């Protein structure tokens, strides 16, 4: 049985798509090993079928500290790969992949890199010259070296299986000013559970890097929104830290808004299928999931994201009329409230965005697996 190594770490945005790819490759008869770092250890579940290896590389701004750490990590990775004898190594970008990718190059193991964002990251750009193929999610990608263009294959991003099981069902008029809306129902469900036809549900989450800003901005925006449209029936599903939830619950209760909170949503499919609109960061995996199911979103890019890639992701979607980008440095509770009210009051805008999202959907788990099989 041929062995394939996947390398991803740092955040859930890198981790979960790589796991989804691993599951597809296992179905095709490969033995899949996954090298990740300590930060992603929390995401490992017993029912995941890939074989995990923890290889941590701590970041440091001091080159004299980082180089010895990198050297040790590379030696460990060389030993690991030498014993495995993989047919290919696939890296998803970010500094946690550096040591395993160097090890693969040293051992002459073919490498493939996958860039999830619309901006080629520093690590992927460095390894581009060594890669057999470069898989990308967006047809338009910034920061791509001229020499790498011949290696490019557009595969789209990889979406988790439980999200892929969702399908879009056209619903008739829901009775609110929102008119016809889309309800996301699990493919295996035969009966649509009844819900309040007038209820507009907003799903708010900040990803694995946290949502502290949202715990302050969103409640303030909802207060303004309800002042402008008191008859609006809202349901809020929101990621929030425990110490923020009491304060937010008090605000929503006074506004007569139904709500659901969690520090982290383990099964996003359950929340996606209830939502009419998402407010989130603009990480690549989030965008791929929303694209796959045609769920429109207001994106507030994380300013500290490497190379400002979240801004480029969100701006590209806005240019394609598939989402809306509000920069954190320029946003206010009033601006966000106005945008939400505009979308609720003009359902055609939401519906068009949903259709545009579905047009750019790709079966990334299959396309990337096909590419890997070509290289092996």
UniProtKB/Swiss-Prot annotation:
Subcellular location: Cell inner membrane
Topology in the lipid bilayer: Peripheral membrane protein
SUPFAM superfamilies: UDP-Glycosyltransferase/glycogen phosphorylase
CDD domains reported in the protein's UniProt record: GT28_MurG
Any one Gene Ontology cellular component term annotated for this protein: plasma membrane
One GO term (biological process): lipid glycosylation
Protein residues bound to UDP-N-acetyl-alpha-D-glucosamine: 11-13, 117, 160, 208, 310
Pathway(s): Cell wall biogenesis; peptidoglycan biosynthesis
A GO MF term: UDP-N-acetyl-D-glucosamine:N-acetylmuramoyl-L-alanyl-D-glutamyl-meso-2,6-diaminopimelyl-D-alanyl-D-alanine-diphosphoundecaprenol 4-beta-N-acetylglucosaminlytransferase activity
EC number(s) reported in the record: 2.4.1.227
Enzyme class: transferase
Catalysed reactions listed for this entry: di-trans,octa-cis-undecaprenyl diphospho-N-acetyl-alpha-D-muramoyl-L-alanyl-D-glutamyl-meso-2,6-diaminopimeloyl-D-alanyl-D-alanine + UDP-N-acetyl-alpha-D-glucosamine = di-trans,octa-cis-undecaprenyl diphospho-[N-acetyl-alpha-D-glucosaminyl-(1->4)]-N-acetyl-alpha-D-muramoyl-L-alanyl-D-glutamyl-meso-2,6-diaminopimeloyl-D-alanyl-D-alanine + UDP + H(+)
Family of this protein: Belongs to the glycosyltransferase 28 family. MurG subfamily.
PANTHER family for the chain: GLYCOSYLTRANSFERASE, UDP-N-ACETYLGLUCOSAMINE--N-ACETYLMURAMYL-(PENTAPEPTIDE) PYROPHOSPHORYL-UNDECAPRENOL N-ACETYLGLUCOSAMINE TRANSFERASE 1
Function: Cell wall formation. Catalyzes the transfer of a GlcNAc subunit on undecaprenyl-pyrophosphoryl-MurNAc-pentapeptide (lipid intermediate I) to form undecaprenyl-pyrophosphoryl-MurNAc-(pentapeptide)GlcNAc (lipid intermediate II).
Name the record gives this protein: UDP-N-acetylglucosamine--N-acetylmuramyl-(pentapeptide) pyrophosphoryl-undecaprenol N-acetylglucosamine transferase
Species in which this protein is naturally found: Rickettsia peacockii (strain Rustic)
């Amino acid at each position: 049985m041929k062995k394939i190594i996947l390398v991803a770490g740092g955040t859930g945005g890198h981790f979960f798509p790589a796991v989804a790819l691993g599951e597809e490759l296992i179905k095709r008869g490969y033995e899949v090993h996954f090298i990740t770092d300590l930060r992603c250890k929390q995401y490992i579940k017993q029912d995941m079928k890939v074989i995990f290896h923890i290889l941590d590389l701590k970041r440091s701004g001091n080159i004299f500290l980082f180089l010895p750490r990198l050297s040790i990590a590379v030696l460990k990775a060389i030993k690991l790969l030498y014993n495995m004898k993989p047919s290919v190594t696939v890296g998803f970008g970010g500094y946690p992949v550096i040591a395993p990718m160097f090890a693969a190059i040293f051992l002459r193991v073919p490498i493939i890199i996958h860039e999830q964002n619309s901006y080629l990251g520093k690590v992927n750009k460095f390894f581009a010259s060594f890669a057999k193929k470069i898989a990308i999610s967006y047809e338009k990608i910034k920061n791509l070296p001229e020499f790498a263009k011949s290696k490019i294959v557009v595969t789209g991003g990889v979406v988790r299986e439980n999200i892929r099981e969702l399908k879009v069902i056209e619903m008739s008029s829901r009775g609110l000013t929102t008119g016809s809306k889309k309800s996301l129902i699990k493919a295996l469900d035969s009966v649509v559970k009844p819900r309040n036809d007038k209820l507009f549900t907003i799903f708010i989450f900040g990803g694995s890097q946290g949502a502290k800003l949202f715990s302050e901005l969103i409640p303030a925006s909802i207060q303004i929104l309800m002042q402008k449209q008191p008859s609006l029936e809202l349901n809020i599903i929101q990621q929030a830290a425990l110490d923020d939830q009491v304060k937010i619950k008090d605000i929503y209760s006074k506004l007569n808004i139904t709500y659901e909170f969690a520090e982290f949503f383990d099964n996003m499919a359950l929340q996606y299928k209830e939502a009419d609109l998402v407010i989130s960061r603009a990480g690549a995996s989030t965008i791929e999931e929303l694209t796959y199911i045609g769920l429109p979103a207001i994106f507030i890019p994380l300013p500290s994201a490497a190379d400002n890639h979240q801004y480029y992701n969100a701006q590209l979607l806005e240019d394609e009329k598939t989402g809306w980008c509000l920069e954190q440095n320029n946003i206010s509770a009033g601006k966000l409230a106005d945008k939400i009210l505009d979308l609720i009051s003009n359902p055609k805008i939401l519906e068009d965005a949903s259709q545009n999202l579905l047009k750019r959907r790709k079966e990334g788990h299959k396309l990337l697996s096909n590419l890997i099989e070509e290289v092996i």
